[in-house]
A protein has these predicted regions:
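A conserved, hydrophobic alpha-helical segment in the catalytic core
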Residues: 127-137, 230-243, 273-304
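Phosphate-binding loop of NTP-binding sites
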Residues: 3-190, 195-207, 212
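Conserved mixed alpha/beta catalytic, RNA-binding, or beta-rich assembly cores of soluble enzyme
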Residues: 330-333
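Cys/His-rich short segments
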Residues: 195-255
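Gly/charged, well-structured mid-domain segments that form the phosphate/adenylate-handling core
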Residues: 255-257, 289-324, 328
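Conserved small/polar residues in nucleotide/adenosyl-binding loops
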Residues: 371-377
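Charged helix-capping and loop-helix junction motifs
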Residues: 149-154, 364-370
Length: 378
């Protein structure tokens, strides 16, 4: 460790202590900004302290990262993470340089499970050479920042190419993740909860992105669709089909706004958060846990924790009313929340707030792509 990098770490930790412990503020970005300004190569110099897992994609990063963290901790690993969702270079640097690093009880290196903004994957991967990339999904999102979905995926691929030995664990239900000219080992997770006798071949709804075959750019068809462009797809023009799944949802029992019960690889599980889309997040965490040899029963226990995830379906009690706060930032995420809302059997009031801040996207035209009529009918 050089004098410059030592100074960077001391400065970052001191600023974090001041912001977090004295002023009781978040301290999620400034410590990292100070560290990078003192030593631009600080991440490269501390990479040997951790095994790194990068979690990226459009939707589900924060919850997936939190669930992976719980699962690995249940498996005996020491885990460092960015729970507030501060997922750009400054926030990630701040998380790592201020972390109190201790060896895992199992004698292995601590694992840094980091939610990473898609546009920042290349910077982080180039500096730290991750052990695993976890890819959740790619949907139309913040066009003013990312462009279309294939541009977004190209940014992720650029990061993957910096770490050719890393495993790429991707959502196999998303056709776009079958693309890419990188040489990394690929493993896939997805849904197989519908029996072949119940398949109903169909095409994705109008305006759905990411449904073109990687072989000839024809429009894919589906044996079933879970939501948006996700499902069991196949080409009608050649032999291209969804890749073989290494981990799969094998059944779904209950879908409610407050919890879901389902099975992954025939292991019964429950998560204390609603929505079909959140089963994907749990499936992702299950897959990571199994890749790190965490026993399924320990994963089950980790999922059943009712600890809330910062900013994700937070439940509050205000003036005698139960309030649930749900963050949405793009059409697919919003439509998924609408699907979850219509499973509520009791009457409820809905308040929707829209902002145009940079972090959430200054272009709000995406609200024109919502299917609110379905919710109104219910």
């Amino acid at each position: 460790m050089t004098l410059r990098s030592t100074l960077a770490r001391v400065t970052a930790k001191s600023s974090y202590w001041l912001l977090h412990d004295v002023l009781h503020r978040g301290g999620t970005s400034l410590p990292g900004k100070l560290a990078v300004s003192i030593d631009p190569n600080i991440l490269t110099k501390i990479q040997q302290d951790f095994e790194l897992i990068i979690v990226t994609g459009t939707n589900g990063k924060t919850l997936t990262t939190a669930l992976i963290t719980r699962v690995l901790q249940a498996g005996g690993y020491t885990v460092i993470t960015n729970p507030s969702g501060s997922n750009m270079i400054q926030g990630i640097t701040g998380t790592l340089v201020t972390a109190k690093v201790k060896p895992s009880p199992n004698g292995k290196k601590p694992i840094a499970v980091l939610e990473v903004d898609e546009a920042n994957v290349e910077k982080i991967a180039a500096a730290m050479k991750p052990k695993m990339f976890v890819l959740t999904n790619i949907f139309r999102d913040q066009l003013d920042r990312y462009g279309e979905i294939y541009t977004t995926y190209d940014k992720i691929i650029a990061g993957i190419k910096h770490a050719p030995k890393a495993v790429v664990l991707a959502n196999g239900d998303s056709p776009i993740f079958t693309r890419g000219d990188f040489t990394n080992e690929r493993k896939y997770f997805g849904f197989n909860h519908i029996q072949p006798t119940d398949y109903n071949p169909t095409v994705a709804p109008i305006n759905t992105d990411g449904i073109l075959s990687p072989t000839d750019h024809s429009v894919l068809e589906y044996d079933f669709i879970t939501y948006a462009n996700l499902g069991k797809y196949f080409s009608t023009t050649d032999s291209f089909v969804r890749p073989k799944l290494n981990y799969q949802v094998t059944s779904i029992t209950d879908l409610t706004p407050k919890y879901s019960t389902f099975s992954i690889d025939n292991t019964p599980l429950r998560i204390e958060i609603g929505g079909l889309y959140n089963i994907y997040n749990a499936l992702t965490a299950f897959a990571v846990g199994r890749e790190f040899n965490v026993d399924p029963e320990k994963i089950k226990t980790a999922f059943e924790s009712n600890a809330q995830i910062f900013g994700r379906q937070e439940a509050l009690h205000v003036d005698g009313k139960d309030v649930t706060i749900v963050l949405i930032k793009n059409p697919v995420g919003t439509n998924s929340v609408i699907d979850m809302m219509v499973t509520e059997k009791d009457d409820f009031s809905l308040l929707a707030l829209l902002n145009a801040n940079y972090a959430d996207g200054i272009d709000t035209s995406w609200i024109c792509l919502l299917y609110t009529s379905d919710a109104a009918d219910d």
